[in-house]
């Protein structure tokens, strides 16, 4: 037995030595293989069934934590690729997930808090740099056009440098900027996208004083996915989510944050305490989401924009305690999770 262990150990040492020697003396050959592997990996297309809706939670965090990417959700239907909200880190995470940003068709913004749109200029630019050769339609409530007009000036020099370097045939500035599809909702909800059997309805939510704020209902092939946006418990969300196959809803653990406020006050961190106190009145606790989702007959519930994020066993248990009574499948989403609506 000892002889066998010595033999295995010696073999491992030999393999490690030879590997390090090869790396040291033949880095060019290895770099070619590595480059080839990376390109082939990045060229692999996502496996999307045209009868299904495929959803990725790119970012599931909130401004209160840095361990997760901020809000961002990718939706694939047939040959269409949409992203809903583009918070900090969404673009980088999307590339890590190998999502084909060069094929992006449209972006939908729920409201203008930075954790939902701060990466929008980067997404517009990055998808173009990666080869997007079609318009990128941006949908959002009032205020969107001003943001995109400012983004034109923000990216103008960057885009000029790209064209000067690579030429206009490679870097066609026709597609370098997002196309504004700003909308105003007159009667609580409005169909803003209706093409190729895909219908997307924007609807008002209650995130006061942040107005306008909206959620989105996505319908295709008798399937429905609803994204709540940021909101306190809102009956319209669950009206839109009635019989939904998938509801993606923000969540906040108010019970934990109330204690956090007291701790911050005791430490004389008054500014932080004030902010943590204020955010509790325009988000939704998990137990309220579960109650209303059960009434709406939601099949699968996914909680994201988790405040705080359940990245340790204690916080995770606090969430689980509040969602245990949901009648269907329920998930505390993580960055990079995938959900398929069949």
What are these regions (language model features)?
Residues 2-23, 215, 224, 232-334:
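Cap/insert and terminal regions of metallo-dependent hydrolase folds
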Residues 2-226, 315-341:
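Binuclear metal-dependent hydrolase catalytic cores
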Residues 247, 341-342:
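Short, solvent-exposed mixed-charge patches
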